[in-house]
């Protein structure tokens, strides 16, 4: 690292909860928070796996006083990966979302890599050169369920060279509407549902949000054993049918690990004024245009190992289910079979459930018939087993 060029970023995390403290008479906004600042945030890593794609999410921070905490995408920037031989690999933001992506690359794992960013207003940023870290394979991803459902990961490095690890994951779960009907409505007509128009089975996907890091440095062997990565509380609807989790593992340098550790402590351990005090967060990205400007992010160069598991609800012990039809009271309407397939209910908040004889149609609330009202999509993921 270039010790003279580190930028010190003060994160006053405890201020976030000051208004909730009973004994606080007024809110104190320190100058660093009250000032109009917009710091560059670079989230991502250089993927050194074979034929791998590298992506960086680049945006700018907002102040605590802003109405939203969502970052502002940094658009129309020029972003490149550089190696120590001067070769440049360009990343582009084709969707206009601030996510810059490379073409598939196979980088020399013996080299070192950095990124260069030039924003639309001409400001230039660069990271320190990062050595390549080869991530060892995941030994196993498994789960235990004495009550809550928890997913664990185990790994080891037989060369005893890694010691520092980071994890993230993506959860996908299958969920049904509260009421499953063989009928749907398309363009005002009753139709028998099939895989092209059904609204009763959905799949939702969510990324991890916690910072998950582990270290074997204190141990005699480079082993991570049964590290918990995700927990689903007892009775959560994520495992009403089938659940899947894709766990990803990244090797880190000690500097990168220390960076993520500070972020973890700052973001997860605060709660009162007596918890973690403002933290000095040192990244490895620098503003060349204005060396005093803080930049948030740490660039690593490493490969990725991943493993997916599937869990059926029937695998679990005494898993609690909420009543699926709670609040789904039905009504009946007279239906003239000669008008089939037209469907024009007086109350548009209801949809077709089933026919109770040739002239009676039972209706249910639309929110009970449509799984997408609870999130997700009716398009089955390509990796789903059936």
Q: Where do the language-model regions lie?
A:
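C-terminal motif of bacterial Sec signal peptides marking the signal peptidase cleavage site
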Residues: 19-23
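Bacterial N-terminal signal peptides that target proteins for export
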Residues: 2-11
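A sequence/structural signal for flexible, mid-protein segments enriched
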Residues: 25-386
């Amino acid at each position: 690292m270039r010790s003279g060029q580190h930028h010190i970023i003060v994160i006053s995390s405890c201020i976030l909860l000051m208004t909730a403290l009973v004994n606080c008479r007024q809110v104190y906004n320190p100058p660093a928070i009250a000032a109009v600042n917009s710091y560059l945030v670079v989230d991502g890593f250089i993927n050194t796996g074979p034929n791998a794609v590298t992506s960086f999410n680049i945006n700018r921070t907002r102040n605590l006083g802003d109405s939203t905490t969502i970052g502002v995408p940094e658009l129309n920037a020029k972003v490149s990966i550089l190696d120590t031989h001067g070769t440049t690999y360009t990343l582009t933001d084709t969707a206009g979302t601030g996510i810059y992506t490379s073409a598939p690359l196979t980088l020399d794992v013996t080299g070192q890599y950095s990124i260069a960013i030039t924003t639309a207003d001409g400001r230039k940023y660069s990271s320190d050169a990062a050595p390549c870290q080869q991530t060892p394979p995941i030994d196993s991803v498994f789960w235990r369920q004495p009550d809550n459902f928890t997913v664990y990961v185990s790994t080891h490095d037989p060369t005893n060279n890694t010691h520092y690890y980071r994890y993230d994951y993506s959860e996908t779960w299958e969920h049904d509407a509260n009421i499953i009907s063989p009928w749907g409505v398309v363009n005002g007509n009753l139709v028998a549902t099939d895989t092209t128009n059904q609204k009763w089975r959905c799949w939702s996907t969510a990324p991890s949000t916690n910072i998950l890091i582990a270290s074997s440095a204190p141990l005699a062997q480079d082993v991570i054993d049964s590290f918990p990565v995700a927990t689903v509380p007892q009775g959560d609807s994520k495992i009403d049918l089938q659940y899947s989790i894709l766990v990803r593992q990244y090797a880190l340098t000690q500097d990168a690990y220390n960076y993520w550790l500070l972020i973890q402590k700052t973001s997860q351990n605060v709660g009162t004024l007596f918890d973690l005090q403002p933290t000095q967060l040192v990244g490895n990205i620098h503003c060349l245009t204005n060396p005093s400007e803080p930049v948030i992010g740490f660039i690593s160069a490493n490969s990725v190992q991943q493993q997916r598991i599937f869990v059926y609800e029937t695998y679990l012990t005494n898993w609690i289910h909420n009543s699926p039809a709670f609040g789904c009271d039905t009504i009946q309407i007279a239906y003239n079979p000669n008008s089939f397939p037209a469907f024009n209910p007086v109350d548009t908040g209801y949809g077709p459930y089933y026919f109770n004889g040739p002239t009676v149609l039972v209706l249910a609330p639309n929110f009970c018939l449509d799984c997408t009202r609870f999130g997700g999509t009716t398009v089955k993921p390509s990796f789903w087993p059936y």
